[in-house]
């Protein structure tokens, strides 16, 4: 009761407040009824619609904020919203036909156009190291007749090997140069922002890139396959640099990355990363985070090239196919969200034929996506 005996006015609670959402439920109901006058609309339909729209908006804003942060901007713009949608697979499928005003476009450069610009026809030519020049033999120096059959056999083997390399490489790729003399680039893919991914058959300790990635554990263990190779090439100086980094950095957390100088190696830096173990909680998400942290460190150093082994598929137990898919997804996602990366070339340094086949196959799918 009021002071004069009248009834106290009751504040009207909106449908949105009753449902616990911010978006206007009443307006949603009007929109639904406007388009479907013949049908009965349930009470929960506009509430559910408002809740879904509210969730999608919050998700897009969070991803757009991350894109703005990566670009070192203090304000979210339509461009960042476009990048947020493009960076998320589900949102990209949902909003595929939606145009975001003032958002710009994501360039989609076909490999054929890039190939024409370079003066080639867009076909892959696997680079095979030419054999050393043979010395001219005098007429008196002739091989015995009995050894001719062996020579033919060797020629057949070399031809067969070259054919296998050509088949392994994807047909719509182009190759330009190698990370080091004497190594074979089996396949190359160009991302839409110009970065190149190359599958290389070589020894990672001999790769001439700005940085090589060393999968390790919490204590910077260098006894793994890649660590042993780097230790043999880098020697005592490399080991001392790793020990100094361990003292300075402390334990390396899962998905973390730290950088040391590449003493005794063709690479300027070595990026040590602690990849997750297959079967652990959120192991797939953590492997993607590991790759992105390695790329972020390379960007901090303004490096132009980085060489990855097959992270996670060794002692950590990831299936090779799964590891390749996650690594390629993380790299593609990183370049989409960063936009201003100094990295121009990413090498996948592999040795066994199974890993090579998997990476060539998965890289070929990037164009389709």
UniProtKB/Swiss-Prot annotation:
InterPro entries: Core_histone_macro-H2A, Histone-fold, Histone_H2A, Histone_H2A/H2B/H3, Histone_H2A_C, Macro_dom, Macro_dom-like, Macro_H2A. Disulfide bonds: none annotated. Pfam families: Histone, Histone_H2A_C, Macro. The modification N6-methyllysine is found at residue 18. Its main location: nucleus. The modification Phosphoserine is found at residues 170, 173. The nucleosome is a histone octamer containing two molecules each of H2A, H2B, H3 and H4 assembled in one H3-H4 heterotetramer and two H2A-H2B heterodimers. Interacts with HDAC1 and HDAC2. Interacts with SPOP. Part of a complex consisting of MACROH2A1, CUL3 and SPOP. There is a cross-link at residues 116-117 (Glycyl lysine isopeptide (Lys-Gly) (interchain with G-Cter in ubiquitin)). GO terms for biological process: DNA repair; epigenetic regulation of gene expression; establishment of protein localization to chromatin; heterochromatin formation; negative regulation of cell cycle G2/M phase transition; negative regulation of gene expression, epigenetic; negative regulation of protein localization to chromosome, telomeric region; negative regulation of protein serine/threonine kinase activity. Residues 184-367 form the Macro domain. It is found in: Nucleus; Chromosome. This is Core histone macro-H2A.1. Keywords: Acetylation, Chromatin regulator, Chromosome, DNA-binding, Isopeptide bond, Methylation, Nucleosome core, Nucleus, Phosphoprotein, Ubl conjugation. The modification N6,N6-dimethyllysine is found at residue 123. Residues 144-160 have a biased composition (Basic residues). The modification N6-acetyllysine is found at residues 116, 123. It comes from Homo sapiens (Human). One of its GO terms (cellular component) is nucleus. Residues 128-180 are annotated as: Disordered.
